[in-house]
């Protein structure tokens, strides 16, 4: 049996995953990286994208992440993500409604701060929608 990788996925709210897996593919800032046990130590920022967790005999887990860092050490892989949501939890119709509301919030913004905040929310929702 192949050696397993210790993998922890942490968001500001909670520990989302902690366990041993066969491989994790992360959306690094310089491109996707497949991480397995014994990988050379590396640190990378994350771009918005999908983390794929592979484990023999189990369905592949796919998790959207927006920003954060990944660190590979001899002990394993730790991902500190700014925002995460399992792809299975996303609903295209609901996201389309939220995008329409966010568009309205941008148009209705009364000052630059509110407009910037609304634009960030809109961009975030569009990134999520692109993954569904």
UniProtKB/Swiss-Prot annotation:
Is this entry keyworded Endoplasmic reticulum? no
Among Gene3D superfamilies, the record links this protein to: F0F1 ATP synthase delta/epsilon subunit, N-terminal
Name the InterPro entries on file.
ATP_synth_F1_dsu/esu, ATP_synth_F1_dsu/esu_N, ATPsynth_dsu/esu_N
Say where the protein is mainly found: membrane
Signal peptide residue numbers = none
Q: Which GO terms describe its cellular component?
A: plasma membrane; proton-transporting ATP synthase complex
Identify the Pfam families for this entry.
ATP-synt_DE_N
* UniProt topology in membrane: Peripheral membrane protein
Tell me the keywords, alphabetical order.
Answer: ATP synthesis, Cell inner membrane, Cell membrane, CF(1), Hydrogen ion transport, Ion transport, Membrane, Transport
Q: Where in the cell is it found?
A: Cell inner membrane
Q: Name one GO molecular function term.
A: proton-transporting ATP synthase activity, rotational mechanism
Q: What does this protein do?
A: Produces ATP from ADP in the presence of a proton gradient across the membrane.
Q: What HAMAP family does the database record attribute to this sequence?
A: ATP_synth_epsil_bac
How this chain assembles, per its entry, is: F-type ATPases have 2 components, CF(1) - the catalytic core - and CF(0) - the membrane proton channel. CF(1) has five subunits: alpha(3), beta(3), gamma(1), delta(1), epsilon(1). CF(0) has three main subunits: a, b and c.
Q: Which NCBIfam families match?
A: ATP_synt_epsi, PRK00571.2-4, PRK13449.1
Family, according to the entry, reads as follows:
Belongs to the ATPase epsilon chain family.
Write down what this protein is called.
ATP synthase epsilon chain
Q: Which organism is it from?
A: Parvibaculum lavamentivorans (strain DS-1 / DSM 13023 / NCIMB 13966)
Q: What is the lineage of its organism?
A: Bacteria, Pseudomonadati, Pseudomonadota, Alphaproteobacteria, Hyphomicrobiales
């Amino acid at each position: 049996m192949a050696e397993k990788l210790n993998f922890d996925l942490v968001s500001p709210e909670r520990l989302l995953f902690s366990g041993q897996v066969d491989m994790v593919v992360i959306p690094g800032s310089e491109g996707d990286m497949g991480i397995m046990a014994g990988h050379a130590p590396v640190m990378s920022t994350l771009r918005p994208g999908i983390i794929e967790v592979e484990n023999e005999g189990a369905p592949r887990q796919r998790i959207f992440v927006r920003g954060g860092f990944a660190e590979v050490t001899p002990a394993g892989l730790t991902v500190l993500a700014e925002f995460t949501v399992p792809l299975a939890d996303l609903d295209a119709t609901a996201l389309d409604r939220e995008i329409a509301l966010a568009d309205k919030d941008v148009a209705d913004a009364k000052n630059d701060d509110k407009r910037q905040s609304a634009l960030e929310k809109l961009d975030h929702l569009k990134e999520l929608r692109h993954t569904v």
